[in-house]
Swiss-Prot record:
A Pfam short name: FYVE
Annotated zinc fingers (FYVE-type), start-end: 997-1057
Binding-site positions, Zn(2+) 2: C1019, C1022, C1049, C1052
Catalytic activity: a 1,2-diacyl-sn-glycero-3-phospho-(1D-myo-inositol-3-phosphate) + H2O = a 1,2-diacyl-sn-glycero-3-phospho-(1D-myo-inositol) + phosphate; a 1,2-diacyl-sn-glycero-3-phospho-(1D-myo-inositol-3,5-bisphosphate) + H2O = a 1,2-diacyl-sn-glycero-3-phospho-(1D-myo-inositol-5-phosphate) + phosphate; 1,2-dioctanoyl-sn-glycero-3-phospho-(1-D-myo-inositol-3-phosphate) + H2O = 1,2-dioctanoyl-sn-glycero-3-phospho-(1D-myo-inositol) + phosphate; 1,2-dioctanoyl-sn-glycero-3-phospho-(1D-myo-inositol-3,5-bisphosphate) + H2O = 1,2-dioctanoyl-sn-glycero-3-phospho-(1D-myo-inositol-5-phosphate) + phosphate
Any single GO BP term: midbody abscission
Matching InterPro entries: MTMR4_FYVE, MTMR4_PH-GRAM, MTMR4_PTP, Myotubularin, Myotubularin-like_Pase_dom, Prot-tyrosine_phosphatase-like, Tyr_Pase_AS, Znf_FYVE
Gene source species: Xenopus laevis
Catalytic machinery residues: C408
Region (Disordered) location: 267-290, 629-694, 960-982
Highest taxon, organism lineage: Eukaryota
Annotated Gene3D superfamilies: Zinc/RING finger domain, C3HC4 (zinc finger) (3.30.40.10)
Topological relation to the membrane, as annotated: Peripheral membrane protein
GO-annotated cellular components: cytoplasm; early endosome membrane; early phagosome membrane; endosome membrane; late endosome membrane; membrane; recycling endosome membrane
Name the UniProt record assigns to this protein: Phosphatidylinositol-3,5-bisphosphate 3-phosphatase MTMR4
Upper lineage: Eukaryota, Metazoa, Chordata, Craniata, Vertebrata
Length: 1078
């Protein structure tokens, strides 16, 4: 028995969703898109000039100049037109047409699509469950943030208690939280906790539930902090033709107004409202009163305002509902109440109007009577009616300070439309990304909007009469508000477009099932991802750059039809979903989404007006580059470049372009992973000048594209440093730098060091200029310092200059570092050689002219900086240009769908990018000035009493032919000895003061905003607050009495490394002098 295998087998959640077998029509076809976790392509074939694929998540059609990406659950119907045409009708009003060469092929794909878009037999057939299971299955310890981001934030999880506190409900004297609906025993379409007046008992609530349709009793959902008025919601009363009444229902409705009088907004002397309610005390949620008379409101607590009952229907429709057992309130039965009818259409009229709108928007060719056809759909008229109803509610609460009760027939379609829209008009919190999530979760999900029936993804139901774009219509109204008030919403139009897509996509479980009870019974929240993981606050794609935080303005929109706009981004067909957006959005995408290198497709789509003259001819001849309409893609000419490259004997290392400027070496293209080089000894002296001109003109074109004219002068000043930067050549046999700490046999890499080159020859210049160029290449050492998860790619700012610090990405560098970093993006490798004493040495390529040497008071500083960069660049690793695996398509977001384009936001990001580049340029200039002051302070003789140092050192000049003779000449000895007296820095006597956490909302370096997944980190050296990407390195700081490695930012890390290298070099310089004196 003990030898038998165990009867239990442990499986992962993803094993419940095995991948399906791929059916290819042609073997040469490849899947044209990167699949999501859990996604499997089932069919792959060809259409007329297109590749078509069907997975368990989407329909993908790749045309020559465009791409169609449609989730399967967004497809409403599939039809065959004209024998060879397939027409896909989507639920967001779009229509996709695909042509096939044969009738048989068209019918075959019609059957495949029809089977793929059938109603699910069970909820596990929805892709949201497979997606979440595979996200868990592929997650490792390093990718833990992926699962963390699948969940909504704490503001969504604890929204009820947070909202009660934020809105200032007095839970002691006016309101109470009733748990009568615990386990949904009273009403399945309501949440478990309900807010009612404090004196209303649970028994009375049960009696009221028998009188309201679907037991949806009047409950309070919002309180305006400035006026104290509240908004309540419910369903219609069941009066019927018999005229039934319910005393408890009438008492509950009038009690809402009385409770508002007991919990008013107290005006402070400065005019700001203050809530006197005690929110921290215990509530009366579990109190069971025998009679409401014992807890009636205190007389004199304030005169209650007249309550406004807003009926979303017309008066005719409300009276007609009495034949079905419904009806409306009579003002005679409800004292101190007023009834207003809004005249909004029911779901059947909205569905017909939407179908007419879809037909008009997809007419081919473009109709000549477009405006009259659009008017005949009455879609804009329905939006106008909704906005008017919400404005009535907002005006009553804000201006008249009256409580409002909103209902329609059942209370889950037009009621959430009016209530949530009014809350957005009243409360600026709901116009933020965080508040909007709370609003949708509360008014739409908690209070039972039937998303499964209205969106058409409820299993085993084919009732078309239940489908209606109710939520889409409400989002259209939000779009109208965003159009009229572009500065009062934290999110942009792309946010709303994404929300429309995932209302129907079934990629996330947020909008599955009909109510909260069904979601908990089916465990949907734990088995699916949340849509707010994509639309979270930290995602800069959906941030409105025009947003003005801190404004408490109540919005009063213009509701006339002539003031409304058709939502073209959703309703009109996209002629080319990828091409128009890529050219504008490429520079704003997150780095990880662009892949490690430029995708060949994106290079082909580069606008030719941004290209140069014939790049290949210019590089060979050294002529000036002029901006014309040449081919922007050099990959097509790779063969020509390789044929032009030459090689000689020897296994020399490949040298980059800036090194070639000093060494007069012709460029050579990489071939696989081989490392070869060419040495041309007989080059004319003008070759470096020509290449310098090429570099300068290429820099000019890059700057003209990326930078505005407002900072042209700053760019020119900074570019002057780049013109002088190249490589310091060192003798191959003697000019070596020994690394005492290196004991491995691995290969090291060539060190490109900036120097001063003029007309192809190295000149004697001040080391201050060398230090300037050094600063430009210092950032190279940061390449391997900032690891980042690919799942966090949307957390980075789009336009910051810190993209270059992310490993494995394309080298998208700041404009002021193009001249130095471009050559280093190649795979520059070096050989590790053994010296005579057995230590590893790093050999610098090139020969040192006899005329070059560092002399003067800056000699020590220059050598220290060189040593520092030697140590830093040696540990760096650069990726080759050729990427072995294809990069993901850059127009896709994390959900596999296109990124919505917004021209206004793109222009604002360009302005933001220019501003950040200007700030970055000014910071670098300040750093240079500080560096120059530090050099002067370091090299200046200390102010101390005169002393005779002639007997301390004996200067013996050896004549062994070494190039180091001039360094230890008599003229430089005195300056070196004087420079050994290093003055005490003022910072060494001070204690670093930390910036408090509450004062830092953004990273001090990359300016990214802190939130739940991007936490604050203090640098122990400077005390500033950084994100994890900018502050994750550790070093001991003896100056701060911190002898164990502690957390420091990248800037301090570089500064400390430079200081240590300077000290080490100072000690190395003293050893020859001491040996000579002995």
């Amino acid at each position: 028995m003990g030898d038998e295998p165990p009867s239990l087998e442990y499986i992962q959640a993803k094993d419940l969703f095995p991948p399906r077998e791929l059916v290819k029509e042609e073997e040469k076809l490849q899947v044209p898109f990167p699949v999501l976790p859990g996604e499997g392509v089932e069919y792959l074939g060809s259409a007329n000039d297109a590749v078509i694929a069907i997975s368990n998540y989407r329909l993908h059609i790749k045309f020559k100049d465009s791409v169609v990406n449609v989730p399967l659950r967004m497809i409403e119907a599939v039809e065959s037109r004209d024998m060879f045409q397939l027409q896909i009708i989507c639920k967001d009003s779009k229509v996709v047409r695909c042509h096939f060469s044969t009738f048989k092929q068209c019918q075959e794909w019609l059957k495949r699509l029809s089977r793929a878009t059938l109603r699910p037999a069970k909820q596990e057939d929805l892709f949201a469950f497979a997606y979440h299971a595979w996200c868990q299955g592929v997650c490792t310890d390093e990718e833990e943030p992926l699962i963390h981001l699948c969940r909504p934030g704490d503001h969504v999880k604890s929204r009820f208690q947070i909202e009660l506190k934020r809105m200032g409900f007095d839970l002691q004297n006016a309101w109470r939280v009733s748990e009568i609906n615990n386990n949904y025993k009273l009403c399945q379409s309501y949440p478990q906790k309900l807010l009612v007046p404090v004196w209303i008992t649970d028994k009375e609530l049960e009696n009221v539930a028998t009188f309201r349709s679907w037991k949806r009793i009047p409950v309070v959902v919002y309180r305006h902090t400035r006026t104290g008025a509240v908004i309540a919601r419910c369903s219609q009363p069941e009066i019927s033709w018999w005229g039934w009444r319910n005393a408890d229902d009438e008492y509950l409705v009038t009690s809402i107004a009385k409770a508002c009088a007991l919990n008013p907004a107290v005006r402070m002397p400065n005019g700001n409202p203050s809530n006197k309610g005690n929110n921290d005390g215990s509530d009366n949620s579990d109190t069971d009163f025998d009679s409401s008379l014992t807890a009636c409101p205190v007389e004199g607590g304030g005169v209650p305002q007249k309550l406004l009952i807003v009926d979303a229907r017309s008066y005719t429709a409300a009276v007609a509902n009495r034949a079905k057992g419904g009806g409306c309130e009579c003002e005679e039965y409800y004292p101190n109440c007023e009834v207003a009818f809004m005249g909004m259409a029911n779901i059947h009229s909205i569905r017909n109007s939407f179908q007419y709108l879809r037909a008009v928007c997809n007419q081919v060719p473009d109709p000549g009577n477009w405006l009259s056809a659009l008017e005949s759909t009455k879609w804009l008229q329905h939006l106008s009616a909704m906005l008017k109803a919400a404005t009535v509610v907002a005006s009553a609460v804000d201006r008249e300070e009256r409580p409002v009760l909103v209902h329609c027939s059942d209370g889950w379609d037009r009621t959430p439309q009016i209530v949530s829209l009014a809350k957005i008009l009243l409360d600026p919190y709901y116009r933020t990304l965080e508040g909007f999530q709370v609003l949708v979760e509360t008014d739409w999900l908690d209070y039972g909007h039937k998303f499964a029936d209205r969106c058409g993804h409820q299993e085993n139901r084919e009732d078309q009469n239940e489908q209606c774009p109710v939520f889409l219509q409400w989002l259209d109204c939000i779009h109208q508000l965003l159009f009229q008030f572009p500065c009062h919403f934290e999110f942009n139009h792309a946010f709303l477009v994404k929300l429309v897509q995932h209302t129907y996509s079934c990629l996330y479980g947020t909008f599955l099932a009909n109510n909260l009870c069904e979601r908990e019974m089916r465990n949907i929240y734990k088995r699916t991802c949340s849509v707010w993981s994509l639309l979270r606050t930290g995602n800069k794609i959906f941030h409105n750059l025009l947003y003005m935080p801190g404004s408490d303005l109540v919005l009063h929109p213009v509701c006339h039809v002539r003031a409304l706009q058709l939502w073209t981004a959703v309703y009109l067909p996209a002629t080319s979903p990828c091409t128009p957006m890529d050219d504008r959005m490429e520079m704003y995408l997150t780095p990880a989404s662009q892949g490690p290198q430029f995708h060949a497709r994106s290079l082909v789509r580069l606008p030719k007006t941004r290209s140069m003259d014939n790049l290949l001819t210019a590089c060979d001849s050294g002529g000036l580059l002029t901006r014309t309409s040449s081919d922007p893609n050099l990959n097509n000419h790779q063969g020509n470049l390789e044929s032009c490259s030459s090689s000689k004997e020897g296994n020399e290392t490949e040298i980059c372009d800036i090194q070639q400027q000093a060494l007069s070496i012709e460029p050579k293209e990489e071939d696989g992973n081989d490392s070869k080089s060419t040495d041309h000894e007989n080059e004319d002296s003008g070759s470096a000048t020509n290449q310098n001109n090429n570099e300068q003109n290429a820099l000019n074109n890059i700057l003209s594209i990326a930078k505005p004219d407002s900072i042209q002068c700053k760019r020119d000043r900074f570019k002057s440093v780049l013109e002088k930067s190249s490589v310091i050549p060192v003798p191959s046999n003697e000019g070596t730098i020994t690394d005492d700490n290196s004991h491995s046999n691995g290969t090291s890499e060539h060190l490109p060091v900036p120097a001063l080159v003029t007309n192809g020859s190295v000149q004697n210049k001040s080391c201050v200029d060398v230090s300037k160029a050094m600063k430009l290449s210092t950032e190279l050492s940061r390449t391997d310092k900032k690891p980042v998860f690919q799942t966090q790619r949307d957390e980075f700012s789009f336009c910051t200059s810190n993209w270059d610090s992310l490993p494995g990405m394309m080298r998208s560098v700041p404009i002021c570092e193009v001249g130095l970093r471009r050559p280093l993006s190649y795979d520059c490798s070096t050989r590790s050689q053994h010296s005579r004493n057995g230590r590893h040495t790093m050999k610098l390529t090139g020969n040192l002219p006899a005329s070059f040497h560092c002399s003067g008071p800056f000699t020590k500083r220059c050598r220290c900086v060189m040593a520092c960069h030697t140590k830093q660049v040696q540990g760096s690793r650069f990726l080759p240009l050729a990427c072995p695996s294809p990069a993901p398509l850059i127009y896709q977001d994390d959900d596999g769908l296109p990124i919505p384009s917004d021209v206004v936001q793109q222009r604002l990001r360009q302005m933001e990018a220019s501003y950040k580049q200007e700030v970055d340029l000014l910071r670098r200039q300040v750093w240079e000035l500080q560096l120059q002051l530090e050099i002067r302070q370091y090299c200046a003789p200390p102010s101390e009493p005169e002393a005779d140092y002639e007997d301390d050192f004996t200067c013996v000049k050896e004549s062994d032919g070494s190039d180091m003779d001039d360094l230890y000449s008599d003229k430089s000895e005195d300056r070196l000895s004087e420079a050994s007296w290093e003055p005490v820095d003022k910072k060494e006597t001070e204690v670093t003061r930390w910036v408090p956490d509450h004062m830092a909302s953004h990273c001090f370096n990359c300016d990214c905003e802190f939130w739940l997944a991007k936490r604050r980190h203090h640098c122990r050296n400077c005390g500033n607050v950084f994100c994890a990407a900018c502050c994750h390195l550790k070093l001991p700081i003896p100056d701060q009495q911190l002898y164990d490695p502690v957390l420091v930012c990248n800037t301090c890390y570089d500064h400390i490394q430079v200081s240590r290298a300077r000290e080490l070099m100072s000690q190395q310089l003293k050893k020859p002098l001491t040996a000579a004196s002995s």
